[in-house]
Swiss-Prot record:
Glycans are attached at residue 83. This is Interleukin-17F. GO terms for biological process: adaptive immune response; cartilage development; defense response to Gram-negative bacterium; defense response to Gram-positive bacterium; inflammatory response; innate immune response; interleukin-17-mediated signaling pathway; negative regulation of angiogenesis. It holds the Pfam family IL17. Effector cytokine of innate and adaptive immune system involved in antimicrobial host defense and maintenance of tissue integrity. IL17A-IL17F signals via IL17RA-IL17RC heterodimeric receptor complex, triggering homotypic interaction of IL17RA and IL17RC chains with TRAF3IP2 adapter through SEFIR domains. This leads to downstream TRAF6-mediated activation of NF-kappa-B and MAPkinase pathways ultimately resulting in transcriptional activation of cytokines, chemokines, antimicrobial peptides and matrix metalloproteinases, with potential strong immune inflammation. Belongs to the IL-17 family. Residues 1-28 form the signal peptide.
């Protein structure tokens, strides 16, 4: 399970970097008329616009990921577990999301301390979403907010006037 989560996280991070590279570089090759399928010619698929690019979604050098200690989510004062979300109309189709194990934080004795709060750390990522018209090779770039870990914070206290 850990290997699957790490692979999914690496894929998510690589896709995020790919999206930033496409957006930030003006050198993205544009092919507005290449690869029109019969569905697109019939008008059922969205037309390729000037802001369209062709992307090879195969991930190269998958085994050259950054080496990270495997148990950091267990050693944290705000530990978490990963849940895999699956969506066949999204690339990557599997994304690992963190879920905090406790509402409080873990103290030095290993006990939950309710005077502190365990909260998720969120990261915005870019994913490719398949267009709903049944165009198998038509995707749009979409932002997603995912939980990547948890951290321990002081609670927000509201004082009654």
């Amino acid at each position: 399970m850990k290997g699957s989560c790490e692979t999914t996280m690496v894929k998510s991070l690589l896709l995020l970097m790919l999206g930033f590279a496409i957006i930030s570089s003006g050198a993205a090759r544009r092919n507005p008329k290449v690869g029109l399928s019969a569905l697109q010619k019939a008008g059922n698929c969205p037309p390729l616009e000037d802001n369209s690019v062709r992307v090879d979604i195969r991930i190269f050098n998958q085994n050259q990921g950054i080496s990270v200690p495997r148990d950091f989510q267990n050693r944290s004062s705000s530990p978490w577990d990963y849940n895999i979300t699956r969506d066949p109309d999204r690339f990557p189709s599997e994304i690992a999301e963190a879920q905090c194990r406790h509402s409080g934080c873990i103290n030095a004795q290993g006990q939950e301390d309710g005077s502190m709060n365990s909260v998720p750390i969120q990261q915005e990522i870019l994913v490719l979403r398949r267009e709903p018209q049944g165009c198998s090779n038509s995707f749009r770039l979409e932002k997603m907010l995912i939980k990547v870990g948890c951290t321990c914070v002081t609670p927000i206290v509201h004082h009654a006037a």
